[in-house]
C-alpha cells in the first residue's frame, strides 16, 4: 500500500472478463484507481483517529510523546500510565516526614524568657537577644521564627516579673534591656521552669505613703512638707521679700524698703556704714542664708525712727526766729545761716520745693521781726547767742544721724562777729541718684 501508484498499476495484471457473448473484454483501469484512492484516504483517516487519543493523553500528562510512537501509530492502551510520577506520595512518607520535625518544648514563654535572662552574664537582655537564645536552644522555634516573636514581646510587656531597663545614652545598639524583678526569683518550683508557683504581681505603693527622700531637705522645704512643724525643726525661715517692694534699681543704686510713703532723700547709709555694722552672722548656721542688710526689720525700724527724729528737728530749727535762711537762686542776700539747695546731676532748674520752703521761712522770720519792732524791743545779744547755740546743737544732731554717710560737712563761718556758722549739704553721688528716683 505504500508503493507508488504507477508501480502498482504496472504490476497489476489486466483481468479479462468475458461478455455475455463469450468474448473477452478489457477492465476499466480508471475505476480501480478510484477505489484504491478511497481505500488509501480511509486508511489515512484511521491512522489519524488512532493517534489522537495518544496525543491527548500526552497532553494530560504534561510530557511530549517520542517521535517513534507517533510514526508507529501505536498509542498507549491505558492513559493512566502517563503522569504517575506526579501523584501525591503515600501516607507512610508523610508520616515519616512529620516524625522528623522537632517537638515543641513543654516550657511556656515566660519560662523561656526567664531562662534566656538568667543565662546572660549581666542578667539582662534585649528582645533580639532573647529571641536569638530561644532559636539557638530549641530547633522547633528555629523553624517557626517570625510567628512567636510577637508572643515574646507581649509576655515581656504584660507580666510584672519582667522589668524594662533603659539603654544608656552612650551605649551603642537599639532597644531597651529586660531583666527579672528581684522579688520574682522564687517564681518557679525548685528552679524548674516546667511549673510556676503563682503569677507574680508587683506591690504598688499606697497613695498616702511618701517615698523617703534620698537627700535631707532644707528647713524651708521641710516646713512646706509638714504644715505643723515640731520643736526639732527650729524657727521658720524669714519671709522672702516681695519682688515689687523695691523700686527699679540701676547701676550704682541700693534698694531700700519703702516703709514710709515719703522716705527721706538724704538719710541713706553708704558703704562705710554697712562695713561698720557688727557681724552677727559669723556664728550663724551656714545653711540658713542671712537676709540682706537693708532688708532687715531692725534696720528698717531704725531708719524710720531716725527719719522721724530728723524731721522733728528740722521743723524745730525752721521755727527759730533768730536764724535767717536764704535759698541760692531766690534773689535775696541776707547774712546768717545759709542753706544751699542741692541740684541733681542733669537737672536744669533749681529745687522748687526747697525754694518754696525757704520763702516760707523768710516770711515767718520777717513777721517775727515786725512784731519785735512793734513792741519796741530789739533782739538782745543773749537772744542771738541762744540762736547760735540752738543752731550748733542742731548741727551736731545732724552729724550724729548722718555719721559716716558724708551728707553734711561743716564749713568755716562766713562774715565777722555776730554771724551764724554756715553748713553746706553736700550729697554723695549715690544720694543724688536716689533723690532723682521716684519718691
From Swiss-Prot:
UniProt keyword annotation of Hydrolase present: no
Origin superkingdom: Eukaryota
Segments of the chain annotated as binding DNA: 104-198
SUPFAM superfamilies: Winged helix' DNA-binding domain
One Pfam family of this chain: Forkhead
Record GO cellular component, one term: chromatin
Basic and acidic residues: bias regions: 1-29
Nucleus among keywords: yes
Gene Ontology process terms (BP): anatomical structure morphogenesis; cell differentiation; regulation of transcription by RNA polymerase II
This protein's name: Forkhead box protein D4
Natural source organism: Homo sapiens (Human)
UniProt gene name: FOXD4
Amino acid at each position: 500500500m505504500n508503493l507508488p501508484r504507477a508501480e502498482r498499476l504496472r504490476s497489476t495484471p489486466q483481468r479479462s472478463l468475458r461478455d455475455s457473448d463469450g468474448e473477452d473484454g478489457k477492465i476499466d483501469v480508471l475505476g480501480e484507481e478510484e477505489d484504491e484512492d478511497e481505500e488509501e484516504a480511509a486508511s489515512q483517516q484511521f491512522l489519524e483517529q488512532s493517534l489522537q487519543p495518544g496525543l491527548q493523553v500526552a497532553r494530560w500528562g504534561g510530557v511530549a510523546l517520542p517521535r517513534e510512537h507517533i510514526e508507529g501509530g501505536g498509542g498507549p492502551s491505558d492513559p493512566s500510565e502517563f503522569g504517575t510520577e506526579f501523584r501525591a506520595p503515600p501516607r507512610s512518607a508523610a508520616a515519616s516526614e512529620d516524625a522528623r520535625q522537632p517537638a515543641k518544648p513543654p516550657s511556656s514563654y515566660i519560662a523561656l524568657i526567664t531562662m534566656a535572662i538568667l543565662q546572660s552574664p549581666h542578667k539582662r537582655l534585649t528582645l533580639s537577644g532573647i529571641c536569638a537564645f530561644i532559636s539557638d536552644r530549641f530547633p522547633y522555634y528555629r523553624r517557626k521564627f517570625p510567628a512567636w516573636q510577637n508572643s515574646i514581646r507581649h509576655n515581656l510587656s504584660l507580666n510584672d516579673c519582667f522589668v524594662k531597663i533603659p539603654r544608656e545614652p552612650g551605649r551603642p545598639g537599639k532597644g531597651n534591656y529586660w531583666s527579672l524583678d528581684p522579688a520574682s526569683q522564687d517564681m518557679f518550683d525548685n528552679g524548674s521552669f516546667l511549673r510556676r508557683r503563682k503569677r507574680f504581681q508587683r506591690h504598688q505603693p499606697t497613695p498616702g505613703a511618701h517615698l523617703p527622700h534620698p537627700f535631707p531637705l532644707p528647713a524651708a522645704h521641710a516646713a512646706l512638707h509638714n504644715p505643723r512643724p515640731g520643736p526639732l525643726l527650729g524657727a521658720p525661715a524669714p519671709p522672702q521679700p516681695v519682688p515689687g517692694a523695691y523700686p527699679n534699681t540701676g547701676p550704682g543704686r541700693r534698694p531700700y524698703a519703702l516703709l514710709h510713703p515719703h522716705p527721706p532723700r538724704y538719710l541713706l547709709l553708704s558703704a562705710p556704714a554697712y562695713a561698720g555694722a557688727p557681724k552677727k552672722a559669723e556664728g550663724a548656721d551656714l545653711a540658713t542664708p542671712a537676709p540682706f542688710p537693708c532688708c532687715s526689720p531692725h534696720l528698717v525700724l531704725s531708719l524710720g525712727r531716725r527719719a522721724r527724729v530728723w524731721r522733728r528737728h528740722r521743723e524745730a530749727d525752721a521755727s527759730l526766729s533768730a536764724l535767717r535762711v536764704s535759698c541760692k537762686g531766690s534773689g535775696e542776700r541776707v547774712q546768717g545761716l545759709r542753706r544751699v539747695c542741692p541740684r541733681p546731676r542733669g537737672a536744669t532748674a533749681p529745687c522748687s520745693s526747697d525754694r518754696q520752703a525757704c520763702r516760707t521761712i523768710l516770711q515767718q522770720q520777717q513777721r517775727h521781726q515786725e512784731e519785735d519792732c512793734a513792741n519796741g524791743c530789739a533782739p538782745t545779744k543773749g537772744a542771738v547767742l541762744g540762736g547760735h547755740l540752738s543752731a550748733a546743737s542742731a548741727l551736731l544732731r545732724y552729724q550724729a544721724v548722718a555719721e559716716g554717710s558724708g551728707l553734711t560737712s561743716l564749713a568755716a563761718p562766713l562774715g565777722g562777729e555776730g554771724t551764724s556758722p554756715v553748713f553746706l549739704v553736700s550729697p554723695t553721688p549715690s544720694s543724688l541718684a536716689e533723690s532723682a528716683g521716684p519718691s
